[in-house]
Amino acid sequence: MTKTWFVTGTSRGMGRELVEQLLARGDRVAATLRRPAQLDDLAAQHGDRLWRRALDVTDADDVRAAMDEAFAAHDRIDVVVSNAGYGIFGAAEDLTDTQIDEVIATNLTGSIQLARAALPHLRAQGGGLLMQMSSMGGYMTFPAFSLYHATKWGIEGFYDAMAAEVEPFGIRTTLVAPGIVRTGFFDAATRVPFSAPYRGGPADGTPTTADEMAVDPVRVVAAMIRAADADVPPRRLVLGTDAYTLITDALTGRLAEVAGQRDNAATADFAAPPQAREC
């Protein structure tokens, strides 16, 4: 059965790959990006199965308008994929206020507003799937990635809470957590020069090389499509052995830290249960 998808950030990388695979299998796609002409080649091949619109995900009004227009143009949208975002690498102290605001506006606030804009439509049609591109960086951290991690940890928390709110309406959510995918993500990322105190420190180094990117974007996208086709899509989709290993190590270490706080945690409890208030 064919599906209709709404996808952000489709100009390159996994967003573009997702659009290509969906169209190749006969699905319909509402694709958004800053410059729709970047998909002219796909439009020529697939005609009206590809709907395009310019979108700035940092503009909440534009996000709502794009979602309204996409749902109006299609009988139903089965899957909404939030994929727009970018990386920034540098020591936390060296980041500028503007850089912080812009990354949060795109990676976190933009994703939140996209989900909020889709929810009324998904409720009205009786359900659907919200799929959010997260990262293994939503569970663990590397030096020099502090701001990027903040946005991924933030969207993980938002989706976890929202999932329980929307499940009664037949709306499912999936957080996609790939490892280091071999795309142009690192090339396109903003790199903040290290100030003198941080040069040569833990943060000062090449984030990764092409040879270290072990995750295939084509296979990541294929796994996303399989997840969307499942009767019950997974709440989390971990993709890549590196992601599985690093997430497992991080969560195991965090649980050990919490376990070590068991006795200390109890010291904050009331000495005796609080008395019930009289009405």
Regions found by a protein language model. Give the residues of each.
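Residue(s) in the substrate-gating loop at a strand-loop-helix junction
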Residues: 135
